Amino acid sequence: FRSDLGVDIELSDIVQRMRFEHPEVKVVVMRSGKDQVFCAGANIRMLGGAAHSHKVNFCKFTNETRNTYEAALKDSGQNYIAAVRGACAGGGYELALACNHIMLTDDSSSSVALPEVPLLAVLPGTGGLTRVTDKRKVRRDRADIFCSMEEGVKGKRAKEWGLVDEVIPNSEFNETVAKRAKELAASSNKVAGQGIMLGPLDRQISDDGSISYSLIDIELDRKFRKATITIKGPENSPPDNGEALTKAGDQSYLLKLARELDDAILHLRLNEMELGLWVIRTQGNPELVLTHEAALLSIKDHWLANEILQLWKRVLKRLDVTSRSIIAIVEHGSCFAGTLAEIL
């Protein structure tokens, strides 16, 4: 498949749903539905005609998606394997690099490559070189040669250089991938209960672009290039045990708010790029916010509580690296406490 924004939106959604809807899954195999190509990388024509700001947002979002499944083993006990058959180039190899284990078939057409420098005179945009040298510990001289080779590296050399973890004969590839996935699943000590369904977000967009969620309102002031984000505090007591939290599902306050805030950040980033100032306000009872946080932390070893905490970590990181001027206003009636105080 081709690494485009639409593909990464779907990939991000899949990774999130694997954590919340299928916590019983221990190994995820990432492979292509086509025989001759694993992933061809970014849509060069799309990027060639795109504004610089869109390119920045595209690369930032795709790297955030890769960071999410790269950390899935440590944070959620889900191991990602890249089963590479065919060309794996540019953003396609960066997809594989974020996995915990890369398996490459040994045939005449399968290779890994970062051809951005020889083809486009730009560096890989979503962490390719960093993961090659810092994560996979490829020698710097080999990394220099590798990123200057348009044709990439195949077979035994890819394994010898550390660009992949395994090279498998084509006739044994599918069998070996399945075997390796079973081995990794068997070695996992991940314990999880029944997953929850992540339903559609309740989002309404008015004619002037203002946005309303169930827990967030966003007002746009285009004259002053400003977006005012108002977060509502909880109204009810929190679930106090894992069973109650699971029963609440995607309607539990901290999970619902995290999903809505994440969606709001991405919407403003990609669709309202002229709004350079974000003002964040809160309304509600700070004591009740603290109660919700304390209840979640008291059961943090429960799989769903852990996933909600990990989601908040990702949302706050996304906010932190967003290229906007962001101001938080703490005033009478606000509820910047506990988890919401992290926004400050």
Predicted regions and their residues:
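Generic, ordered loop/turn and secondary-structure boundary motif
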Residues: 39, 45-48, 113, 120-124, ...
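Amphipathic alpha-helical segments at domain termini/boundaries
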Residues: 2, 39, 94-98, 137-249, ...
